[in-house]
Regions:
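Structured catalytic-domain cores with a bias toward divalent-metal coordination
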Residues: 2-8, 12-22, 41-593
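Bacterial N-terminal signal peptides
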Residues: 26-40
């Protein structure tokens, strides 16, 4: 059945026939309803091996498939993009199936091979329904970055061979949507969060085209970093599932290697796994215990070859995953339980440079010659000199920061932008029924730093040192009590713990809490400071010790400030992180209904 289902605020559209009609026409629904067969429509949208559909053509192709196969498919609007156009989800099979696979295309519309591959794959499956495994649902986002997709051009991908035209990396607000899955500055990301949690995929694929070195294979793969993923899923992924994907791709003549993230200027010096933290698509998926794969088709291979390699991966993925049946979903349930059984969770990682593996790498010989442009040495890969040799491979990561897993988080309702993102991720919570005071674990930010230049609309902040203590906290009717015994537990820890590499704190959601609001005038405070030292011998001794240590470098203003922060006048909430915790093992009041 051809359906236009909506999530969240888009329900307002589905309930309004006039607005719904406008949405459908904007999606060129008329094409799907006027007898144009999917094959003809697809041929129009990919008129040559070096072309890729425009946004409306991709949407129309999936709409036509849904119209032609109503008993097997749905076509849904799940939100609105920043450019005002709808976001779509095409599904084959029942969303309640034991195995659910989600494919996201054109997060970077200049890298569109997944769009072509997904249309071809869906067509292939629907024309041969016996190839669709039982109890399996496949969901496809035709083009996620709609704004970037509308910005068609020939040339912004300077390193890339084809297609003739493609979209642009940034969205309508010039955001890189593959850095936006936690901060959700875009409407796209907020809608995607909600759709992702509702669909609850077991496997998530994000299709891309690479940058970087030249080498022989047409496809490389970023797999959810196993050490970061952790738990029973990680062992199965690394030792069983991922090796099967590589082996089956090779058997079909489409050799695939890990993503080429070079340690040095060329792969000869080795490669290191790409660490997809939660800002990235598959890193976000890992917060919900989904296995993620990012396909990276090689930029210098012909576009048709990149599409073919991506298509083959989708086929192999479905075939391999279907053999596991409901095993993956059972592993994910075990993963959630394993996470909650721990007292601490890693929230930042780095490559372990002491654990070096070896990878047989099919590359091209790198040569250096003099540039006719700059007069300096330049790099050239010699395709007439291919090689296969072992190179160092850094595949092991270790945590660098941990955060406690509490019994519950407490989030004041004042931080509404955080609450909005929690809602999008299906977080369950209770509201404080009346104003009250609770003794909670309070985190004070003792050291932090921010990037001097903006990055994706923010000055990224790193929290370097915190202190936790139990203190009375004033709460107000409507504040959130968030128990951890829920499926979103890992998402909560990694976004609400200030140490998290992609926590809300890192993306400036709580910056105003760091600022001191009241100060003193020295000429007024001098008498108070003198009285403090006279009446408190211990304070006076500590003050003299500080003076001796800092000497002449300790200015008179700094000395008074030291005393001010130990006086009753100091507000005490500056640098107090405004999310609180109920430590593990303690009772949680106001349980959710």
């Amino acid at each position: 059945m051809l359906q236009f289902l909506t999530f969240g605020p888009m329900n307002q559209i589905s309930g309004d026939p006039i607005r719904l009609r406008h949405v459908l026409l904007g999606c060129t629904c008329v094409l799907a309803l006027t007898g144009i067969l999917p094959s003809n429509l697809i041929a129009q949208s990919t008129s040559s091996p070096n072309s890729t559909p425009e946004w409306h053509q991709a949407v129309a192709a999936f709409q036509a498939l849904a119209s032609a196969h109503e008993n097997l498919t749905t076509f849904q609007v799940f939100g609105t993009s920043d450019v005002g156009r709808p976001l779509h989800l095409f599904t084959i099979g029942s969303p309640t199936s034991d195995l659910r696979i989600l494919i996201n295309n054109a997060i970077h519309p200049g890298e569109p091979c997944g769009v072509n591959a997904s249309i071809a794959w869906a067509t292939e499956l629907l024309e041969n329904p016996e190839q669709i495994p039982d109890n399996t649902c496949i969901a496809i986002v035709p083009m996620y970055n709609v704004g970037g997709g509308l910005r068609r051009n020939c040339c912004t991908r300077a390193n890339q061979l084809g297609p003739e035209e493609y979209g642009f990396r940034g969205n309508a607000r010039n955001l890189d949507l593959n850095r936006d899955f936690i901060k959700c500055d875009s409407r796209n990301a907020l809608a995607f969060n909600e759709m992702f949690v509702r669909f609850d995929p077991d496997i998530f694929v994000d299709t891309h085209t690479s940058n970087g070195a030249d080498y022989q294979p047409a496809l490389t793969l970023i797999t959810t970093q196993p050490d970061k993923l952790g738990g029973p899923l990680a062992a199965w992924l690394e030792n069983d599932f991922a090796p099967q994907l590589y082996a089956r791709m090779a058997k079909r003549g489409e050799r695939m290697i890990p993503y080429v993230n070079s340690i040095e200027s060329t792969p000869d010096g080795g490669i290191v796994d790409f660490l997809e933290t939660p800002r990235y698509s598959t890193g976000y998926g890992a917060l919900h215990h989904a296995i993620g794969f990012t396909t990276e088709a090689h930029m210098l291979k012909p576009f048709s070859q990149r599409v073919s390699a991506t298509l083959e991966f989708l086929r192999v993925l479905l075939e391999t995953a279907a053999e596991e049946g409901g095993y993956i979903r059972n592993l994910r349930q075990q993963q959630r339980a394993a996470f909650l059984s721990s007292d601490l969770a890693p929230v930042a990682w780095e490559a372990d440079t002491t654990a070096i593996d070896s990878l047989s790498f099919p590359g091209f010989t790198a040569r250096y010659e003099w540039s006719n442009v700059t007069g300096s040495r330049r790099l050239r890969y010699d395709r007439e000199a291919p090689y296969e040799k072992a190179i160092p491979y850094l595949h092991t990561f270790q945590p660098t920061r941990f955060a406690p897993i509490p019994e519950a988080f407490v989030v004041p309702q004042a931080w509404r932008h955080v609450v909005e993102r929690l809602d999008a991720n299906g977080v369950e919570y209770a509201r404080v029924p009346e104003d009250t005071t609770m003794v909670l674990e309070v985190t004070t930010i003792l050291a932090h730093s921010a990037s001097p230049r903006p990055y994706e609309g923010h000055h990224y902040r790193t929290v370097e040192k915190v202190q936790r203590s139990m203190e009375p906290v004033r709460l107000y009717k409507g504040d959130l009590i968030i128990p951890m015994n829920q499926s979103a537990a890992r998402y909560l820890v990694e976004t609400l713990s200030p140490e998290g590499v992609d926590a809300f704190m890192a993306w400036n959601f709580f910056d105003s809490a760091l600022q001191q609001k009241e100060y003193f005038s020295a000429y007024v405070f001098e008498e108070t400071a003198e009285a403090m030292l006279r009446e408190d011998a211990d304070l006076n001794a500590k003050f003299e010790e500080e003076k001796a240590q800092k000497g002449a470098a300790w200015s008179s203003r700094a000395q008074l400030d030291w005393l001010y922060k130990r006086s009753p006048h100091y507000e005490g909430t500056a640098s107090r992180y405004p999310v609180f915790s109920i430590p593990k093992g303690q009772p949680v009041p106001f349980q959710r209904p």
